[in-house]
Amino acid sequence: MYRAGVTLLVVAVVSFGRWDSVTVATTIRVGWWYEPQVKMAYIYEHNDTNLTIFCNTTAYDSPFLASGMMIVLPHRTQFLTRKVNYSEDMENIKQNYTHQLTHMLTGEPGTYVNGSVTCWGSNGTFGAGTFIVRSMVNKTAGNTNTFIHFVEDSELVENPAYFRRSDHRAFMIVILTQVVFVVFIINASFIWSWTFRRHKR
């Protein structure tokens, strides 16, 4: 029994290392593990009082898509809106999903300047983007037009810690699930072979 226990431990450790690399490869190749793509835009009009946020999230070949947006200000964090779509048979049916989320916030002039907006999507892994709201007041005399601003990749900042932790946690859950499955198979095989040998005697 002692020998079997040592063997099991070694195999489990090796399997963990193997699944670590295999899981990374799988997340790159399996269709619904591609993280959702997030595109964002906003309008900050009427002397920086009305902030309208646009968030488009797209997931390809996925069993579901859950999207949402939030804003972080110096003294509060506010979840703004969310949306979920999924196929009737998530195990076998994969679809392409696009969510177009829009939300308008109204406050005192300058309330949302320098606030950070995060839009995200999840189809089994996270795709998220965060940008900083900038003033859109046009100082030119007589020019009152405010245009939509499409957020470029160069304007993205680091996502809130929640999303970084969630990405790591989801990845580790996949790895640990694989390890538990491998250990279960090894145990089952050992028990079966030991029982078979005992009956054979």
UniProtKB/Swiss-Prot annotation:
It is a single-pass membrane protein. It is found in: Host membrane. Residues 26-170 are extracellular. The keyword Transmembrane helix applies. The chain crosses the membrane at residues 171-191. Residues 1-25 form the signal peptide. Residues 192-201 are cytoplasmic. The keyword tRNA processing does not apply. Glycans are attached at residues 47, 50, 56, 85, 96, 114, 123, 138. Keywords: Glycoprotein, Host membrane, Membrane, Signal, Transmembrane, Transmembrane helix. One of its GO terms (cellular component) is membrane. Its main location: host cell. Belongs to the HHV-5 UL120 protein family. This is Membrane protein UL120. The lineage of its organism: Viruses, Duplodnaviria, Heunggongvirae, Peploviricota, Herviviricetes. The gene is UL120.
